[in-house]
Amino acid sequence: MMKELIPLSARFTEALRGAADLHARQVRKGTKIPYIAHLLGVASIALHHGADEDEAIAALLHDTIEDAPRELGANWVQNWLRFRFGERVLEIVEGCTDADVSSKPSWRRRKESYIAGLPKEPSSVLLVSASDKLHNASAVLSDYREIGNRVWARFDKEAGKDGTIGYYRGLVTAYQRTSKHPRLIRELDAVVAQIEVEAGHLGVWPLPR
């Protein structure tokens, strides 16, 4: 059931400005697309699936802890999120962050830990997280159609084609187990399935060791 419409306030506008400032010098991997395009896409998907204002703000800011300029530091970003937007927005953003940026483990360990933790996350985190993954997976599919297997070089060397597709399949399975946001998860599942078909590779998670 869709939530009652809540008009977006000046807080959302402030979050949009903050996202634009914090990610101003960043582009999407392997492209010249400004990173803000991804953040707007995630917020749009979340709103389409019933996000309230806190969830929409968290969608805009979901990458700030991991990807804000290093000179600011994760602690500064967390304090800024808490002071400007409140504890709930901070908690959603933290729930969407897949690693402690002060001691970032390997790609495999980060992704295994993230997927394992999803069933314990509240509905708001799952909404923003799945919106992020749907936007990312849709970009992977679009880019694969344009440049073929070269797209996998944009990802962590430890991931490659097998790891990337396997990770998305593992995400879908984890989201499905929560029984939250079923329409959103069906959309993600459909995109991941299409990647598997077109790339000729069924995703397997966890990855073989």
PLM features: residue spans?
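Active-site helical microenvironments for divalent-metal-assisted chemistry
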Residues: 1-209
